[in-house]
Amino acid sequence: MRKYEIMYIIAPNLEEAANKEIIERFNGVLTNQGAEIEKVEEMGKRRLAYEINKFREGYYVLLNVKADADAIAEFNRLIKINDNVIRVLITKDEE
């Protein structure tokens, strides 16, 4: 298993409960695929550097996980389908 850092931005027009539901759903996707979530950091609502899908701000979430490539591929596939997530970045954490 490799270490990955995942950052995604949720649309700002959702309520706090909806944000929590999205975060829990995607954490569940990773754990169901056998990944270990080391850290979840909800960075809150921040201004974007440029407009994405007509939004000027977004709700940032940062994850540090240990996972196989298959788990990351499934996470990436499902998060890109979700209309409430406006951007995602997945990087390998080289230590």
Swiss-Prot record:
GO terms for cellular component: cytoplasm; ribonucleoprotein complex; ribosome. Keywords: Ribonucleoprotein, Ribosomal protein, RNA-binding, rRNA-binding. It holds the Pfam family Ribosomal_S6. Disulfide bonds: none annotated. Gene3D superfamilies: 3.30.70.60. It comes from the Bacteria. Binds together with bS18 to 16S ribosomal RNA. This is Small ribosomal subunit protein bS6. The lineage of its organism: Bacteria, Bacillati, Bacillota, Bacilli, Bacillales.
